[in-house]
């Protein structure tokens, strides 16, 4: 082989090696980019509360949970804005109070963690935001506003200590004037806790009480019709969505 041919062969070999190396580097970078674009785990929100969280509606004397409830409507609204990056779980249990949630003495059939005290239950949950909606059963079970205040304060303090974002909700009003006056005192306690602990509040009691003919949107003495559940979800969304946006922006 002449020197010229040897040089040409050497150059070709070097170019082949360089091209192969460049191709491998590009492939590795493509794999890295693809890996960095893997789907994020969704931001989880847990909604705790009574039957108005669960979504009970009554018709012709028959009451039961409906798919058209405030939590479902909130999920739909968040999904429309953020896609599948947000997931809301309805953990409402009929007939329960904030004290029962705190102590883990609610309906154990509601799930494997329903019988756990609040701290243990929340520590086991991956949810980043927790919605808390109570007040009606406190009235029906003759609790005092002070007892309710103590329970909700503990729920909020524990949630924050565990790195969760609590959001308090006042109950929707009740058509019975006597019961509603007592419920107003419970709503005042929820507002007090929200102010003292500096946590977000959805004041459903005040909002719904200001609606004209709001009683026509109730299916019985405590539970909204689907139309009112949708209105409640709109109020929830105004408070919850900015929290969701900030948390999504901070997620890796």
Spell out what each predicted region is.
Residues 44-49, 53, 87-92, 128-134, ...:
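Structural recognition of the beta-strand scaffold that forms the well-ordered cores
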């Amino acid at each position: 082989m002449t020197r010229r041919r040897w040089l040409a062969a050497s150059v070709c070999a070097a170019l082949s090696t360089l091209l192969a190396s460049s191709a491998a580097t590009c492939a590795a970078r493509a794999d890295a980019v693809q890996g960095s674009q893997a789907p994020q785990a969704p931001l989880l929100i847990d909604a705790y509360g009574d039957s108005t969280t669960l979504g009970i509606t009554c018709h012709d004397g028959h009451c039961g949970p409906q798919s058209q409830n405030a939590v479902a409507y909130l999920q739909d609204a968040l999904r429309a804005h953020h896609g599948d990056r947000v997931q809301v779980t309805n953990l409402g249990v009929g007939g329960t109070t904030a004290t029962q949630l705190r102590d883990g003495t609610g309906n154990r059939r509601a799930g494997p963690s329903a019988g756990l005290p609040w701290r243990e239950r929340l520590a086991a949950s991956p949810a980043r935001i927790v919605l808390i909606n109570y007040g009606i059963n406190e009235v029906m079970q003759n609790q005092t506003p002070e007892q309710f205040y103590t329970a909700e304060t503990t729920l909020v303090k524990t949630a924050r200590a565990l790195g969760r974002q609590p959001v308090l909700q006042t109950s929707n009003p009740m058509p019975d004037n006597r019961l509603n006056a007592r419920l107003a005192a419970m709503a005042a306690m929820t507002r007090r806790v929200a102010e003292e602990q500096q946590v977000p509040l959805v004041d459903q009691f005040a909002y719904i009480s200001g609606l004209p003919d709001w009683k026509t949107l109730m299916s019985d003495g405590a539970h909204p019709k689907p139309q009112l559940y949708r209105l409640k979800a709109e109020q929830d969304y105004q408070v919850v969505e900015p929290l969701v946006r900030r948390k999504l922006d901070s997620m890796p």
